[in-house]
A protein has these predicted regions:
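Charged, alpha-helix-enriched surfaces in structured cytosolic catalytic cores
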Residues: 10, 34, 38, 69-72, ...
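C-terminal alpha-helical "lid" subdomain
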Residues: 109-181
Length: 181
């Protein structure tokens, strides 16, 4: 969990890539109960895999659907992910910008980065603004052709998310490219 642009979805993709697992991205806002159950069963049947439920707080605020036209019921989702069907081989990743909007039945943060509901959500990880070293690496990678911009970028992007750092560097690089034209 964490602010937008911190790399939550990118982390899920990187985990899938690192372990050579398919990433099954469930678009909850477009699913009804049957769609969700069918997609879950298909993923379990074809496991090992990763299921990504992205921006969960955009679909449910606690147990209440955010969109009145939504056809996926929270209880169906809950029963499916913790149901009687063996889900071994499935890594479930849920991302959210607002962990306070996640219902306790899914699992809430404890002081040890674990969940109050192991078996549904086992670990809770916060992704925030970038620390200096990874920020430097990202900046140097994006601005490799303009090292003179890197020092300023490092100083000017404190407390930025990864997406904000990337956008900042791209804008600086575009200015340099336009100067050449």
């Amino acid at each position: 969990y964490g602010p937008a642009g911190t790399g939550k979805s990118s982390l899920a993709k990187a985990i899938a890539q690192q372990f050579g697992l398919p990433l099954n991205h469930f678009y909850l806002s477009t699913m009804d109960d049957d769609d969700f159950k069918r997609a879950w069963e298909n993923s379990v049947t074809n496991s090992p895999c990763i299921i990504l439920l992205e921006d969960f707080d955009n679909v449910f605020n606690k147990r209440t659907p955010v969109n009145k036209e939504q056809n996926l019921n929270f209880v169906t989702l809950l029963n499916t992910i913790s149901g009687v069907q063996d889900s071994s081989g499935v890594l479930l990743i849920i991302t959210t910008n607002h962990i306070e909007n996640i219902d306790d039945a899914i699992g809430v943060y404890t002081d040890k980065n674990t969940s109050s509901r192991p078996g549904r959500i086992d670990r809770i990880v916060y992704l925030g603004e970038m620390d200096e070293m990874p920020r430097k690496k990202l900046i140097n990678k994006i601005l490799k052709d303009w090292p003179e911009l890197a020092d300023d970028a490092i100083n000017e992007t404190k407390n930025f998310t990864a997406a904000q750092v990337q956008e900042y560097c791209i804008q600086k690089a575009l200015i340099k490219l336009q100067e050449k034209i």
